[in-house]
Amino acid sequence: MPRIRTWLAPYSWEFVTAQNALLCHAKNALHKPTSEGHDTTQRLWEERHLQPMPLDEAVDLCRRCHRLAPFCFYNGNTFAGIIRDVIHNLNLPPEEAFILRSLAGHIVAGVSTGEEEKAFREFCESLDRGQ
């Protein structure tokens, strides 16, 4: 499986916004763009999400977008959910998929350890080797 792909292409900014709205609605939280981060994040996402990139770069883009805080609530859940869906679509064995979704979610949320980041990077590098 090639390491460099258009991992985030299915997830338009409209999808990102709708995902955040669903998360907010489920928790009775305000779904609203922020005045400081929304436009910057939207531009970044629209410039990058269709480009081929390594999986670890796609995770980093989601992390950056989370940190820019485009919405009032659930930014981390929004972007972690997207990257978890990307990993789900790899059709990996269930145990491996669970671990990788967890690692990617931690990286996006900014709570990963160096060891977790290293493990995820090693998995990403293995994609080119077909392992």
Which sequence ranges carry the predicted segments?
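FIC/Doc superfamily catalytic core
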Residues: M1-Q131
